[in-house]
Regions:
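BRCT (BRCA1 C-terminal) domain core and associated BRCT-interaction motifs
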Residues: 1-44, 88-177
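Short hydrophobic beta-strand segments
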Residues: 71-88, 124-126
Length: 177
């Protein structure tokens, strides 16, 4: 597929994967216009606009699509995400979104090798439900590296792919428990 037709801007797996891959995202008027004119119409003239959601999520869909179309499936290229079991949305959904953005995914446990996490391009994603395993991994990492391990919520991926701009600050870090 090269085009996603939508009535509204959402943060669904389908929408995020389309953004990550640099697909055109259009409103329903694109289809109606093509039916009326009986010819293919450039989708760029019918880019979806949802000003309320764009404002809510601090982004502009046309700007985001421009960035993603310049370098499709590249936002997370070279990045590996170690994802704990109880993350929401599910590890499967996050995997598809991350892979659409060019990244890769591994399963994280309390016994994940701390050496692989030392890279600037290795990121851990977890949730409060994984607290025991996260604590074990953080302890292991701190002993090996002398510094704390940042663990992010899934929001780092969802918001980053939505905006086509990653935020590795503490904004999306899982709070210490």
């Amino acid at each position: 597929a090269h085009v996603l037709v939508a009535k509204a801007l959402t943060r669904t797996e389908k929408m995020l994967c389309a953004i990550a891959r640099g697909l055109d995202i259009v409103n329903v008027s694109w289809i109606k216009t093509m039916i009326r004119k009986r010819e293919r119409i450039d989708p760029k003239a019918h880019v979806l606009r949802d000003r309320n959601r764009e404002h809510q999520w601090s982004m502009s869909l046309p700007d985001v699509l421009s960035r993603s179309q310049d370098n499709p499936s590249s936002l997370l290229r070279g990045h590996t995400f170690y994802i704990f079991k109880h993350t929401e949305p599910s590890r499967d959904v996050l995997t598809r979104v991350i892979e659409a953005a060019g990244g890769s995914v591994e399963h994280a446990t309390g016994k994940t090798d701390a050496r692989v996490l030392a890279s600037d391009q290795a990121h851990v994603i977890g949730s409060a439900a994984d607290e025991t395993a996260i604590h074990a991994l953080q302890s292991h990492y701190t002993k090996a590296h002398g510094s704390p391990l940042a663990v992010y919520t899934a929001e780092v991926v969802l918001a980053g792919v939505l905006r086509q701009q990653m935020d590795w600050t503490s904004t999306y870090q899982l709070s210490a428990t």
